[in-house]
Each structure stands twice: as C-alpha cells, then as structure tokens.
C-alpha cells in the first residue's frame, strides 16, 4: 500500500518492470498526493471492482486471490477531522466489509496509548472511532502482533486492520 504518492507515468513503468504489474491509484492527477494499491505479479489477483475517492484519500479494491474473495482498503485521512472522516468511510462501506477485508493506511489519529504523548488528550471523535472499530470487530494486526510495547515509533500512525467474524 502506498501513501502520499506523486507518481508520474514513467514511474509506473519502472514499477511494472520491477514486478509490480497491477497498480491501482486512487486518482489520476499527478500533482496531488494520493493513495494507491500495488500488487506483485507473483500473486494471482483478479480485480472485480474498484472504488476511488476523487481527492485520492481512499481506494477500495475488491478481487480474488487464489479463488478467495478479498477487499483491500487503503485510507489516507486528512490532518483535520481524521477520526470523523475514517468513521464515515467505514460506515458508508459497512455492507461491503466482510471477514476477508484488510484496511491499511495513515489515519492521522492516535488510536493507541502507545502513539500518544502524555500531554495528548483523547477527544470524543477518537473515542467514537475506536468504538466503531470495536463494534465492527476489527483486529489491529500491527499493534496486536508486531509492536507489543511502547517503542520509539516517532509519529507513525499507520494502521492495518483485519475484520473477523
């Protein structure tokens, strides 16, 4: 998953030469930062449907990998109002989210205590977003399995969620 990409046409050619044959940008404007999903040629992926936001803040890719349906969502939340933005996306696409959904991205929101400085407050929008994620039964794969304790993660607020039923 790529965040804040500024890829030009010749950059896409270089990606394809290096084995990233399937590339799905959220928008086509070269000047704007956008998110994208790139899939290796080694993976048998068949695209079914793709939904993009015109500003390039998110992309939802539906397809099949080895005869298994999968949804991949890449979100780049704006700096202001990020919790409400993410919550709205999740609620708008709630019917499309199933047990084979992976959500990745830059949420620009400290959802975990490990990502906050001691002076940072948790506001009601963050609490509401966390409640929505809990209600939808998401698992934070990155924090749950790969970063077990508070580390110097600087300002990294990327997330990877997997929906389980």
Residue ranges and their predicted role:
Residues 1-165:
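A shared catalytic/ligand-binding motif for oxyanion handling
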């Amino acid at each position: 998953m790529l965040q804040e990409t500024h890829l030009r046409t010749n950059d896409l050619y270089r990606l394809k030469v290096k084995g990233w044959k399937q590339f799905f940008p959220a928008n086509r404007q070269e000047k704007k930062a956008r998110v994208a999903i790139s899939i290796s040629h080694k993976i048998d992926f068949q695209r079914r449907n793709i939904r993009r936001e015109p500003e390039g803040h998110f992309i939802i890719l539906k397809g099949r990998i080895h005869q298994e349906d999968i949804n991949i969502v890449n979100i780049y939340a704006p700096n202001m109002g990020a919790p409400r933005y993410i919550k709205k996306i999740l609620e708008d696409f709630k019917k499309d989210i199933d047990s084979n959904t992976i959500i990745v991205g830059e949420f620009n929101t400290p959802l975990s205590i490990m990502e906050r400085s001691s002076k940072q407050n948790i506001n009601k929008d963050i609490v509401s977003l966390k409640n929505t994620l809990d209600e939808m039964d998401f698992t934070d794969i990155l924090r749950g399995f790969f970063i077990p304790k508070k580390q110097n993660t600087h300002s990294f607020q990327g997330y990877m969620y997997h929906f389980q039923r």
